[in-house]
Regions:
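Helical scaffold of the NTase/Pol beta-like nucleotidyltransferase catalytic core
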Residues: 128-130, 160-187
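Short, flexible loop/turn elements at secondary-structure junctions
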Residues: 82-86, 147-149, 161-162, 191-193, ...
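Short glycine/proline-enriched turns and hinge-like loops at secondary-structure junctions
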Residues: 155, 199-202
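Conserved His + Asp/Glu catalytic blocks
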Residues: 166, 184-187, 193-199, 210-297
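Structured alpha-helical segments in the cores of large, soluble enzyme domains
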Residues: 141-147, 171, 175-179, 225-232
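Active-site microenvironments that recognize anionic phosphate/pyrophosphate groups
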Residues: 1-164, 238-240, 255-258, 264-297
Length: 297
């Protein structure tokens, strides 16, 4: 009835504006989260996830369109997902965006400034978006959920500063800082190399959630012992790709060994196996670290 243009982009801008009027202010959401956290971390995330769906920040009606199933394989029961929930790009909105004055605010869709942002045709509205402040690695980080989650309670943890992705020892420590706060969640990082793709490399962030994937349940195929790290259980996981699992009681010790492995792998070249550490100055070797707490380890 003429309140907005009849396209997905403009309807999303409009309904998010309406929901923003009903969404509690950030301070109230943060206070409720930490009050519940005092009872248990799971109580806090359960409530925050339900809240994010109630405000329509997580568009559950669209997520229901995704095709998901589990199929048995020699490596365990694999989760297969076909993402059908993200709306198609609207040609009219694309044309309108080309005519708009370019904006560098927010710097990206992960920046904390997205909370409460009105949006535009080429940047989603976030008036119904609320984020939870955390401390990780001695600095300010924030927790939110993915509006288009691929699994249960698919969360995003992002740096309070707009700083690039980087896999190093400090990244490992931040992952452990998170699972110590939320032991029922796993958390991991995408690779930090442009050639891999699939991530926003300009803003440091991790992804996690409340789900158990097949790789988590996969057994150790070949056990290894690292000199000087007898307290760390290590081994190659039975998986179609190269996966090294490290397990121990002390996060700092695991971080030390993981960093040692990372540094060795970054410079590793084996032409016979078609593995090159770099070509024309472009690095090729990195890892995708994932942290979780299982049975106290």
């Amino acid at each position: 009835n003429g309140l907005c243009q009849d396209s997905v982009v403009y309807r999303d801008l409009f309904d998010t504006k309406l929901m923003g009027l009903l969404t509690p202010r950030p301070s109230a959401v943060i206070r409720r989260f930490w009050d519940l956290y005092a009872e248990s971390p799971k109580a806090a995330t359960d409530d925050y996830y339900a809240f994010s769906k109630t405000t329509n920040y997580i568009r559950a009606d669209r997520l229901a369109k995704d095709a998901k199933w589990i199929t048995p394989t020699p490596y365990g029961d694999m989760d297969i997902t076909i993402n059908l929930s993200k709306p198609e790009k609207d040609p009219k909105a694309i044309a309108a965006a080309l005519q708009m004055k370019q904006s560098a605010y927010p710097k990206c869709q992960l920046c904390k400034e997205n909370e409460g942002y009105a949006g535009r045709v080429n940047h989603p509205a976030r008036q119904n978006h609320r984020i939870i402040p955390l401390e990780m690695g001695g600095g300010p980080w924030f927790l939110q959920y993915s509006p288009y989650g691929y699994y249960n309670e698919h969360c995003i943890v992002f740096n309070g500063r707009h700083t690039p992705m980087k896999i190093d020892r400090s990244a490992f420590q931040k992952l452990f800082d998170f699972v110590e706060k939320f032991p029922h969640y796993f958390v991991g990082s995408n690779a930090d190399l442009p050639i891999v793709g699939g991530s926003i490399l300009t803003h440091e962030h991790f992804q996690g959630g409340h789900y158990t994937f097949a790789m988590t349940k996969a057994p150790i195929e070949t056990a290894y012992a690292f000199a000087g790290y007898k307290d760390i259980e290590a081994g190659i996981v039975k998986w179609p790709m190269s996966v090294l699992r490290l397990r121990g009681d002390e996060p700092a010790r695991i971080c030390d060994l993981a960093d040692k492995v990372l540094q060795a792998w970054r410079g590793y070249t084996d032409p016979d196996a078609f593995i090159y550490a770099e070509t024309d100055g472009t690095p090729h070797n990195t890892i995708t670290p994932i942290a979780r707490c299982r049975n106290g380890k």
